[in-house]
Curated annotation (Swiss-Prot):
PANTHER family: FAT-BODY PROTEIN 1-RELATED, LARVAL STORAGE PROTEIN/PHENOLOXIDASE. The gene is SP2. Coiled coil: none annotated. It comes from Bombyx mori. One of its GO terms (cellular component) is extracellular region. Belongs to the hemocyanin family. The keyword tRNA-binding does not apply. This is Sex-specific storage-protein 2.
Length: 704
């Protein structure tokens, strides 16, 4: 990377009562062949807990013979392995599937291979029909979801939002109980009484108002953040990330970005934690708590969620992690952490055919792989037992569930599913612990020299930001997959069940950037948000604050000689997406030869409405950093991972570290650093200030 320019401004995020109208769905046109295939894919996600014997997938799947069609797969060995496991006995139907359990995961990978190595779409579809009819529902959905995302001939096809596929993973038992009662009564016996409990009917939909977990049931301060940790868009985002790059995924086998996988892992969690930290700050909670494997963890968690047969395990406050049941796991976790520190102290790592120099910035790939403990860390020649994985063991210990009853039966915890992990405060404490270990590696990197930082002839002269306001709005999603329907109901297009809750959003805003350039050049502009003060109101230094930087946008621009004025609207920020479109609307769009653009091309991005943290009534100060550097597109062949790796340079949080840790040495080579100051409810000259108005709650029972 060559040269970085920085502009730091103080901004304040505000909370407003204004609720703007939803934006128009951005779509793209598709041909008739695409529409036919897309409808076939979507058919697998309807009424997922039961079989529709009248559907095409059932008629094909019940008689499809995989062995007789062996020539229609590009990897016969993988097909033979699947058949061997299938004949031995796959996971029974109706049991809960989790990828964090050995036997269930091995079977799901074998099934994914069957899908992945299908020679053409027709074979892929028939294989999916077979699995939909004969295999466990959750296991099928997991493998099929990833297959659609990863198969080259499925590029552009839409998969439904995870909260429509697995609605029970995105709402608590209170809402489920309302849905079950309504379904069993075949509607609302007494509409007036139902309305008092937040249930009403609109056309062909039953709507259920839902609260987030509150202080009555969730008796520690973490409940203030449930509007964020239980947000269905954020939890779906995490599931998309796993589907994009599963921890068991072998890059050489499936063709993923092997050279930057660990970098992506670190970047994803650093950004997720920074975003979570923003919410902690604006809610007065401060830094993410730390914990010890040998001491009780202060933060309890009560999921109030259900599987088909059991409730989720609960973890009380001050839960003792180091119990007799966990002795072996805790010993492994502690040893794994100490081993990494020993690697750093030696300055290098050498094993599994790898030789890593920790002074090389590219060593971040190994470091990230080490903490994800993924398949690329060891290579194809090493058989990896993921039951002795750091992440798997840590999730098991913190989840506080009892030991599994057998290879398929377990009491789940929120940590057992990617759809629910973000709901547990211990999740953030665990990954903050991992990221802090990775940051220790950063201390071994050399600071940038002047020739690496200086963008010759280019200087940022000014940045202005519109007023920033946040608000809460109503949102509904289709929860029909949480219940069973009769054959007649399925045939006659049954009434849909909608779960309704509030969610965080913000008003659109512009960022105005002025750049003086002596040369015409292709440049990259990055914008990052960072806190100005810690939870005690003490200004944060750049050296100590770089891990809290949250990337807002990345884009290329052509600089001309002279003054360049750049106006960037928040709706253009490329690493965010609009909310997913319901399946019912997707089917209507397909009839018009269209699909939602964001769900087709940018499904794995963070929801656009969550780019800003919840504001406060008086305004909460943040800093905006703007960087400009030359565009380096050499060797960029990273699709479909462009959502994580955007150019040939290291990701923002990686190259910013040695810059900021040593920035005082290089002030002379950085064109300009602005540090605006402002005060709440004031307006100072040349400051970027955003005022807030009072928020009006949409549901009076919900208190944030």
């Amino acid at each position: 990377m060559k040269s970085v320019l920085i502009l730091a401004g103080l901004v304040a995020v505000a909370l407003s009562s204004a609720v703007p109208k939803p934006s128009t769905i951005k779509s793209k046109n598709v041909d008739a062949v695409f529409v036919e295939k897309q409808k076939k894919i979507l058919s697998f996600f309807q009424d997922v807990s039961q079989l529709n014997t009248d559907d095409e997938y059932y008629k094909i799947g019940k008689d499809y013979d995989i062995e007789m069609n062996m020539d229609n797969y590009t990897n016969k060995k993988a097909v033979e392995e699947f058949l061997k496991m299938y004949r031995t006995g796959f996971m029974p139907k109706n049991l809960e599937f989790s990828v964090f359990y050995d036997k269930m995961r091995d079977e799901a990978i074998a099934l994914l291979d069957l899908f992945y190595y299908a020679k053409d779409f027709e074979t892929f579809y028939k294989s999916a029909c077979f699995a939909r009819v004969h295999l466990n529902q959750g296991q099928f959905l997991y493998a099929f979801y990833i297959a659609v995302i990863q198969r080259p001939d499925c590029h552009g096809f839409v998969v439904p939002a995870p909260y429509e596929v697995y609605p029970k993973m995105f709402m608590n038992m209170e809402v489920l109980q309302k849905i079950y009662v309504t379904k069993m009564q075949h509607g609302l016996i007494n509409p007036e009484a139902a309305a008092k409990y937040g249930i009403h009917k609109e056309n062909d939909y039953f709507v259920y108002k839902a609260n987030y977990s509150n202080a009555v049931l969730y008796n520690n301060e973490e409940q203030r953040l449930t509007y964020f940790t239980e947000d269905i868009g954020m939890n779906a985002y995490y599931y998309y990330f796993h589907s994009h790059l599963p921890f068991w995924w072998t890059s050489e086998k499936y063709g993923a970005l092997k050279e930057r996988r660990g970098e992506v892992y670190f970047y994803f969690y650093q950004q997720l934690l920074a975003r979570y930290y923003f919410e902690r700050l604006t809610n007065g909670l401060g830094k993410i708590p730390e914990f010890s494997w040998y001491s009780p963890i202060k933060t309890g968690y009560y999921p109030l969620m259900l599987t088909k047969f059991t409730p989720f395990a609960q973890r009380p406050d001050y839960y003792n992690l180091h119990t007799e049941e966990n002795y072996e796991r805790v010993r492994f976790l502690d040893t794994y952490e100490k081993t990494f520190v020993q690697f750093l102290q030696k300055d290098h790592f050498e094993a599994f055919g790898q030789k890593i120099d920790f002074h090389d910035p590219k060593a971040i790939n190994f470091v990230g792989n080490y903490w994800q403990d993924n398949a690329d860390l060891y290579g194809e020649e090493v058989t990896k037992d993921y039951q002795r994985s750091y992440e798997v063991f840590a999730r098991r210990v913190l989840g506080a569930a009892p030991m599994p009853f057998d290879k398929y039966t377990f009491m789940p915890s929120a940590m057992d599913f990617y759809q629910t992990s973000l709901r547990d405060p211990a999740f953030y404490q665990l990954y903050n612990r991992i990221v802090e270990y990775i940051v220790e590696f950063k201390q071994y990197l050399k600071p940038y020299t002047q020739d690496k930082l200086y963008f010759d002839g280019v200087k940022i002269t000014d940045v202005k930001v519109d007023k920033l306001t946040t608000f809460f709005e109503n949102f509904e999603f289709d929860a029909s997959n949480s219940v069973y329907f009769s054959k007649e109901e399925i045939k006659n297009n049954h009434v849909h069940e909608l779960r309704c809750a509030t969610r965080l959003n913000h008003s659109p805003f512009n960022v105005n950037i002025e750049v003086d350039s002596n040369v015409a050049s292709d440049a990259v502009v990055k914008m990052l948000l960072a806190p100005k003060y810690d939870d005690n109101g003490i200004p944060l230094t750049l050296e100590d604050n770089w891990m809290k930087f949250f990337e807002l946008d990345w884009f290329t621009t052509k600089l001309t000689a002279g003054q360049n004025k750049i106006i960037r609207n928040s709706n253009e920020f490329v690493i965010f997406k609009e909310d997913s479109v319901p399946m019912t609307e997707i089917m209507k769009m397909l009839d018009e030869g269209k699909v939602p653009f964001d769900m087709s091309e940018e499904f794995c991005y963070m929801p656009k409405r969550l780019m800003l943290p919840r504001g406060t009534e008086g305004g909460f100060p943040f800093q905006l950093f703007v960087f400009v550097y030359p565009f380096d597109n050499k060797g960029k062949d990273l699709a479909p991972f462009e959502s994580f790796v955007l150019d040939n340079n290291l990701l923002a949080s990686l190259w910013i570290a040695p810059l900021l840790m040593h920035y005082s040495r290089f002030l002379t080579c950085i064109s300009r650093i602005f540090s605006f100051t402002t005060r709440v409810n004031g307006s100072l000259t040349n400051s970027i200030f955003l005022r807030m108005t009072h928020m009006i709650m949409l549901f009076q029972k919900i208190k944030f």
